[in-house]
Regions:
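Active-site loop-to-helix "anion-binding N-cap" substructures in soluble metabolic enzymes
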Residues: 1-249
């Protein structure tokens, strides 16, 4: 299963807000076949969202997963994710890397644990402002990819999300042609470093809205989007999904 549009709610949502969200989404989504769409609510709301989204085909994922289980207070194991019905997990979001000091090696272990148990992975990479200004984005991304993914056997259950840190919540979206070139670079590096020469789908994340989605989705190597703030509004999320479905028509 290939996921194209994913909403990352981060630490947002409430029981009432989630109910309103699903109503807005249902009223605005154009197609009943939405199996390539997904959201990552806070873990505590996953069961509620499964019930609210029942019959829609909307996938539910976790925002993070741990590499093992047991005496790890606050961690969420792969088994727990699967048990509550998650079909995938984000791994490596910049906020996890920064706030929880997760290294490339830590993230590699998470990817391995998820793949061994059949949980799909959306692996996040992205450069900080300093690398963007210094024009060393490719070198930074290559290091993240090689240290986390080298010699792993990847399949269609693995997706990359390119999320430049400096573009998160800033309304500073890179030029679509620059994003496209970066996505092509990412695909080439993953293809060359993975054990089976796998070329992944690459989603873009960083201030994606319905206003810039059409321009982004026209690019050859932008396969979809990982959406933050805009995904908190059910109507806005549906509009972005509709734009992606109708791209090139």
């Amino acid at each position: 299963m290939s996921l194209s549009i994913i909403g990352n709610w981060k630490s947002n949502g409430s029981i009432k807000l989630n109910e309103s969200w699903i109503l807005e989404f249902k009223n605005c989504i154009n197609d009943s076949e939405i199996s390539n769409l997904a959201i990552c609510p806070p873990f505590i709301f996953i069961d509620q969202m499964f019930n609210l989204a029942s019959g829609l085909g909307l996938k539910i994922g976790s925002q993070d997963v741990d590499s093992s289980s047991g005496a790890r207070t606050g961690a969420i194991s792969v088994e727990a994710c699967i048990d509550v019905g998650c079909c995938f997990s984000l791994i490596g979001h910049s906020e996890r890397r920064e706030l929880f000091h997760e290294s490339n090696i830590d993230l590699r272990q998470k990817v391995i644990a998820a793949q061994e148990r059949g949980l799909q992975v959306v692996f996040c990479i992205g450069e900080p402002k300093e690398q963007h200004i210094a024009a060393t984005t490719n070198e930074f991304l290559e290091e993240q990819i090689i240290n986390s993914l080298s010699d792993l056997e990847l399949t269609d259950s693995f997706t990359i999300a390119y999320v430049p840190i400096w573009a998160i919540g800033t309304c500073e979206t890179p030029d679509s042609s620059d994003i496209n070139a970066t996505h092509k670079f990412i695909k080439d590096i993953v293809q060359s470093t993975s054990k089976n020469n796998f070329t992944p789908n690459v989603l873009y994340g960083g201030s994606v809205t319905s206003k810039n989605a059409e321009v982004l989705f026209k690019e050859q190597y932008i396969d979809g989007a990982l959406i933050g703030g805009a995904s908190l509004n059910g109507k806005e999320f549906a509009e972005i999904a509709n734009i992606h479905k109708n791209r090139g028509l």
